[in-house]
Protein backbone atom coordinates (compact mmCIF):
# COMPACT_ATOMS: atom_id res chain seq x y z
CA UNK A 1 0.00 0.00 0.00
CA UNK A 2 2.90 2.35 0.59
CA UNK A 3 3.68 2.42 -3.13
CA UNK A 4 0.14 3.63 -3.83
CA UNK A 5 0.58 6.57 -1.50
CA UNK A 6 3.37 8.15 -3.54
CA UNK A 7 2.66 11.46 -5.20
CA UNK A 8 0.12 12.93 -2.79
CA UNK A 9 -2.83 11.49 -4.70
CA UNK A 10 -6.03 10.01 -3.35
CA UNK A 11 -5.75 6.23 -3.18
CA UNK A 12 -8.53 4.32 -4.98
CA UNK A 13 -8.90 0.62 -4.20
CA UNK A 14 -11.39 -1.56 -6.05
CA UNK A 15 -12.07 -4.81 -4.21
CA UNK A 16 -13.19 -7.33 -6.80
CA UNK A 17 -13.33 -11.06 -7.64
CA UNK A 18 -13.42 -13.08 -10.85
CA UNK A 19 -16.89 -14.46 -10.05
CA UNK A 20 -18.46 -11.04 -9.40
CA UNK A 21 -20.81 -10.09 -12.26
CA UNK A 22 -21.16 -6.46 -11.09
CA UNK A 23 -17.37 -6.14 -10.92
CA UNK A 24 -17.15 -7.36 -14.51
CA UNK A 25 -19.86 -4.89 -15.57
CA UNK A 26 -18.00 -2.05 -13.87
CA UNK A 27 -14.74 -3.05 -15.53
CA UNK A 28 -16.44 -3.29 -18.92
CA UNK A 29 -18.60 -0.14 -18.74
CA UNK A 30 -17.22 2.24 -16.12
CA UNK A 31 -13.47 1.77 -16.27
CA UNK A 32 -13.41 2.03 -20.07
CA UNK A 33 -15.16 5.41 -20.08
CA UNK A 34 -12.68 8.02 -21.40
CA UNK A 35 -13.59 10.61 -18.74
CA UNK A 36 -13.21 8.07 -15.92
CA UNK A 37 -9.89 6.84 -17.33
CA UNK A 38 -8.55 10.38 -17.65
CA UNK A 39 -9.66 11.44 -14.17
CA UNK A 40 -8.18 8.35 -12.58
CA UNK A 41 -4.86 8.72 -14.36
CA UNK A 42 -4.55 12.40 -13.43
CA UNK A 43 -5.85 12.33 -9.83
CA UNK A 44 -5.80 8.86 -8.30
CA UNK A 45 -3.41 6.09 -7.34
CA UNK A 46 -5.49 3.10 -8.43
CA UNK A 47 -5.30 -0.59 -7.60
CA UNK A 48 -7.60 -3.56 -8.02
CA UNK A 49 -7.52 -6.19 -5.28
CA UNK A 50 -8.95 -9.65 -5.87
CA UNK A 51 -10.53 -10.65 -2.57
CA UNK A 52 -9.94 -14.33 -3.36
CA UNK A 53 -6.19 -13.72 -3.75
CA UNK A 54 -5.74 -11.27 -0.85
CA UNK A 55 -8.48 -12.03 1.68
CA UNK A 56 -6.50 -10.38 4.47
CA UNK A 57 -6.93 -6.94 2.85
CA UNK A 58 -10.63 -7.56 2.32
CA UNK A 59 -10.92 -8.33 6.04
CA UNK A 60 -8.79 -5.31 6.99
CA UNK A 61 -11.12 -3.00 5.05
CA UNK A 62 -14.26 -4.86 6.16
CA UNK A 63 -15.33 -5.68 2.61
CA UNK A 64 -18.62 -7.58 2.79
CA UNK A 65 -19.92 -7.17 -0.75
CA UNK A 66 -18.46 -6.72 -4.21
CA UNK A 67 -17.54 -4.51 -5.78
CA UNK A 68 -16.48 -2.27 -2.92
CA UNK A 69 -14.42 0.84 -3.58
CA UNK A 70 -12.26 2.32 -0.85
CA UNK A 71 -10.82 5.82 -0.94
CA UNK A 72 -7.81 6.69 1.21
CA UNK A 73 -6.07 10.02 1.59
CA UNK A 74 -2.50 10.46 0.38
CA UNK A 75 -1.19 9.32 3.77
CA UNK A 76 -3.16 6.07 3.58
CA UNK A 77 -5.84 7.02 6.08
CA UNK A 78 -9.27 5.64 5.11
CA UNK A 79 -11.76 8.25 3.91
CA UNK A 80 -14.79 6.21 2.85
CA UNK A 81 -16.01 2.99 1.28
CA UNK A 82 -18.54 2.86 -1.53
CA UNK A 83 -20.16 -0.56 -2.04
CA UNK A 84 -21.84 -1.68 -5.24
CA UNK A 85 -21.75 -1.03 -8.95
CA UNK A 86 -21.24 2.56 -10.10
CA UNK A 87 -21.73 3.82 -13.62
CA UNK A 88 -19.25 6.28 -15.14
CA UNK A 89 -21.09 9.50 -14.23
CA UNK A 90 -21.68 8.50 -10.61
CA UNK A 91 -18.09 7.34 -10.14
CA UNK A 92 -16.76 10.58 -11.62
CA UNK A 93 -18.85 12.66 -9.21
CA UNK A 94 -17.64 10.63 -6.23
CA UNK A 95 -13.99 10.77 -7.31
CA UNK A 96 -14.19 14.54 -7.79
CA UNK A 97 -15.87 15.01 -4.40
CA UNK A 98 -13.16 13.00 -2.66
CA UNK A 99 -10.03 14.09 -4.55
CA UNK A 100 -10.90 17.80 -4.24
CA UNK A 101 -11.57 17.31 -0.51
CA UNK A 102 -15.07 18.75 -0.87
CA UNK A 103 -16.06 16.44 1.99
CA UNK A 104 -14.24 18.84 4.33
CA UNK A 105 -16.89 21.46 3.56
CA UNK A 106 -20.05 19.36 3.45
CA UNK A 107 -21.73 16.06 2.70
CA UNK A 108 -21.91 14.47 -0.73
Regions from the language model: what does each represent?
Residues 1-2, 22-41:
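Typically the conserved alpha-helix immediately C-terminal to a functionally engaged Cys/Sec
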Residues 2, 13, 38, 89-96:
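Solvent-exposed, polar/charged alpha-helical surfaces in well-ordered, non-transmembrane soluble domains
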Residues 5-6, 38-41, 61-65:
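Extracellular/periplasmic catalytic domains that process cell-envelope and extracellular macromolecules
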Residues 6-20:
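Short active-site neighborhood of thiol/selenol oxidoreductases, capturing the structured segment around
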Residues 50-52:
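Conserved acidic residues
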